[in-house]
């Protein structure tokens, strides 16, 4: 039988993903180019095989102008899944950004792409498809520069029995709830799309950090840099609105498309959607389709409470003309279960006004009917001007309240709070204000005609980035005025309990889903009227507030969840402060299918022991991250820039000298390439509070190497240093081939700290590892005594001062008297801009060999710093490795040392000295030279000691 592959002519491979290759093919009969995605099934896990088949079946059902065209798919010989899609001549968005050479896209073009992507995402979500891997490299461009969304390898159709909690995707685009291992829904795609638009606007990822801990911290704080000033405030506010930490407050795709700023683009590109349709695996009837969507969206305990649209294939619900209304007999203590009874009963009777009043638009999507478009059955509204004023007042009130990621149903409260800097949602019946980035005076009425347009240009207006449609679901509220609002403490405890409960439970079923919507619906009208009542009471204390009498108590008592804002949980990796430089990023090019969690509960992705703080300031609170990343070492790619770094010291107490000898931890740094690397730190000497058995590098703080000055004047009381056995120094030597390159990385040397005063000689050799400030700058060496922490601001000043000192001194001059001896509170550390490739592996191995041959021998180092009690600091010698004179002297000393060792038959030490040399050796010549000088210095000390001891014996 002829294979389908015979219809295509293979041209070239144009890409490679996590599971297969993308090949450009030419259809022989059609004479048209396509892309063949070939996924190999052999040697794949069952999950990967299932994912491949899922992608094949899913993309075959998806048809949309802004989603890659599907041609055909089949399984080739039982070994490969072949998927043929349309070819996008423009490449992907990531490539286009690289080719632009830093020239930003025009805002018109960016908004065009933004709108097209939103339409594609809206289409997917309306058909229950979660993409889960939205990123710039999966956004393709046609020759006409139109967008095509592709790569559905991680996409998932949400069903009633799905947990939707698998940790998949690309780290830089993962939403906070996914990183926190909270079940997530469609709002996770909104977050990822916001990251994409941010990156397309700023040419840099929205979130990047040294490692996973730093990335999680930034994502949890929604800490993004400023967007280029060439873009309008409306666009910036739209992007920021998509990156709200709490998924409940993120707008969905339909809401963003309703924003006035995007309307010209929506009108231009939406008409092409008339032919878009989807062929479900089985027909979705109205009741089951709505039930399936409701239950599947509940897989995120705090998402999609307002995204209740169904496709045009479904039977549309119409608000009945009869006068059936949902009444509340005891609104003071209405629970979700009580709401459920009303919702189910009304749904069975065909009356869905308690859930949502909807109408079909021209494209088959049911959309919420705004308050001014409701039938007469619904409760009367306030006049338009009053509603607009109340909306502004609601904004002002909502700004005072913050909601953490897991607090799903936090309501605005009148309790005074210090959370003034946190953006909070406003349940306001106006969708046009999603993207305003200013602050409006609460007491100033705004004309309704200017509210949507002028507020975007008002310098002081506040951004209500998330607005839900008005849902007056309970026409007549019957409040119980005899109820008393619970105290803030009781409410806080109730909310904490609910938050913990939500973290542990599985996604609820349909009753829970619909009850949340009804619960939310019942609250909106009361919220607005309550705000107006409060403001009226402030302006006219003597006038009783009718709105407050009618609606305040029912709103407060509608849920056991607190209306007091929960203190923001600040999750920062260390109490001493974490430096997460924006120039260092986790790779954004790898889809982390292997990052997916195992099903058993014994491998938690992250366990936050959080300490809540009363205000929202991002201070460094003690939080413990416990990681257990299964099967991550081969999948996760971590990149390191060589231009900046954060530092932390790991200290070893020295009870003999009182000097804290600081062990240097070399963290591996790599040029931004495609070589996957996982940072590992198994040293128990780190200061972070992590479990010692984790295999992942556990913190965003880098350690740095502490160097010593090479003093030409030996100290009067040098420190005796013992040699430790070789098993106490762990080194990684798996990068021998890459170290010799120009931008090769420092090999990490994990040294264990010990409470006793035994310190390995390796420390001193490591401290000689020199960093170059520039290509023509001399080596910077320093001694640190009792260093506590490193302050980057002071550090840079110290480096500049030292550079100025060195510029004034040549290598031939006498040693300068200026040296930097760190007091306990001083900070000094060279900033490595172009690090020398240093290999601690050879040095460590060589000294370990020495220690094995003479473990009990005590040696004094000629370049050990003086003791802290010595009033005169050691003299620093300016060393320039590139100086031919010094290099010649060092090489001469190396030859003399080798000859002496050979003459004394000390072959083991001779082998150690010569070990770094050779074609296949990773240690550079400079390191070997210093190694030789160090050994020679120690030998001279040994000879002097032996001579002095021999002369003393002769005298006796």
Curated annotation (Swiss-Prot):
<feature type="compositionally biased region" description="Polar residues">
    <location>
        <begin position="839"/>
        <end position="863"/>
    </location>
</feature>
<dbReference type="GO" id="GO:0106310">
    <property type="term" value="F:protein serine kinase activity"/>
</dbReference>
<comment type="similarity">
    <text>Belongs to the protein kinase superfamily. NEK Ser/Thr protein kinase family. NIMA subfamily.</text>
</comment>
<feature type="compositionally biased region" description="Polar residues">
    <location>
        <begin position="544"/>
        <end position="553"/>
    </location>
</feature>
<feature type="region of interest" description="Disordered">
    <location>
        <begin position="349"/>
        <end position="379"/>
    </location>
</feature>
<feature type="binding site">
    <location>
        <begin position="14"/>
        <end position="22"/>
    </location>
    <ligand>
        <name>ATP</name>
    </ligand>
</feature>
<comment type="subunit">
    <text>Interacts with ARK1, ARK2 and ARK3 (via C-terminus).</text>
</comment>
<keyword id="KW-0418">Kinase</keyword>
<dbReference type="InterPro" id="IPR011009">
    <property type="entry name" value="Kinase-like_dom_sf"/>
</dbReference>
<protein>
    <recommendedName>
        <fullName>Serine/threonine-protein kinase Nek5</fullName>
        <ecNumber>2.7.11.1</ecNumber>
    </recommendedName>
</protein>
<feature type="binding site">
    <location>
        <position position="37"/>
    </location>
    <ligand>
        <name>ATP</name>
    </ligand>
</feature>
<feature type="region of interest" description="Disordered">
    <location>
        <begin position="666"/>
        <end position="701"/>
    </location>
</feature>
<feature type="region of interest" description="Disordered">
    <location>
        <begin position="397"/>
        <end position="509"/>
    </location>
</feature>
<dbReference type="GO" id="GO:0055028">
    <property type="term" value="C:cortical microtubule"/>
</dbReference>
<comment type="function">
    <text>Involved in epidermal-cell morphogenesis in hypocotyls and roots. May act on the microtubule function. May have a secondary role in trichome branching.</text>
</comment>
<feature type="active site" description="Proton acceptor">
    <location>
        <position position="133"/>
    </location>
</feature>
<dbReference type="GO" id="GO:0007017">
    <property type="term" value="P:microtubule-based process"/>
</dbReference>
<feature type="compositionally biased region" description="Basic and acidic residues">
    <location>
        <begin position="284"/>
        <end position="293"/>
    </location>
</feature>
<feature type="compositionally biased region" description="Basic and acidic residues">
    <location>
        <begin position="360"/>
        <end position="375"/>
    </location>
</feature>
<keyword id="KW-0808">Transferase</keyword>
<dbReference type="GO" id="GO:0043622">
    <property type="term" value="P:cortical microtubule organization"/>
</dbReference>
<feature type="region of interest" description="Disordered">
    <location>
        <begin position="276"/>
        <end position="307"/>
    </location>
</feature>
<feature type="compositionally biased region" description="Low complexity">
    <location>
        <begin position="403"/>
        <end position="416"/>
    </location>
</feature>
<keyword id="KW-0547">Nucleotide-binding</keyword>
<feature type="region of interest" description="Disordered">
    <location>
        <begin position="803"/>
        <end position="876"/>
    </location>
</feature>
<dbReference type="GO" id="GO:0009913">
    <property type="term" value="P:epidermal cell differentiation"/>
</dbReference>
<dbReference type="InterPro" id="IPR000719">
    <property type="entry name" value="Prot_kinase_dom"/>
</dbReference>
<feature type="compositionally biased region" description="Polar residues">
    <location>
        <begin position="811"/>
        <end position="820"/>
    </location>
</feature>
<dbReference type="GO" id="GO:0004674">
    <property type="term" value="F:protein serine/threonine kinase activity"/>
</dbReference>
<dbReference type="GO" id="GO:0005524">
    <property type="term" value="F:ATP binding"/>
</dbReference>
<keyword id="KW-0723">Serine/threonine-protein kinase</keyword>
<dbReference type="InterPro" id="IPR008271">
    <property type="entry name" value="Ser/Thr_kinase_AS"/>
</dbReference>
<feature type="compositionally biased region" description="Polar residues">
    <location>
        <begin position="685"/>
        <end position="697"/>
    </location>
</feature>
<dbReference type="InterPro" id="IPR017441">
    <property type="entry name" value="Protein_kinase_ATP_BS"/>
</dbReference>
<dbReference type="InterPro" id="IPR050660">
    <property type="entry name" value="NEK_Ser/Thr_kinase"/>
</dbReference>
<feature type="compositionally biased region" description="Basic and acidic residues">
    <location>
        <begin position="490"/>
        <end position="499"/>
    </location>
</feature>
<keyword id="KW-0067">ATP-binding</keyword>
<feature type="compositionally biased region" description="Polar residues">
    <location>
        <begin position="727"/>
        <end position="748"/>
    </location>
</feature>
<feature type="compositionally biased region" description="Basic and acidic residues">
    <location>
        <begin position="824"/>
        <end position="836"/>
    </location>
</feature>
<feature type="region of interest" description="Disordered">
    <location>
        <begin position="715"/>
        <end position="757"/>
    </location>
</feature>
<feature type="region of interest" description="Disordered">
    <location>
        <begin position="535"/>
        <end position="588"/>
    </location>
</feature>
<dbReference type="Pfam" id="PF00069">
    <property type="entry name" value="Pkinase"/>
</dbReference>
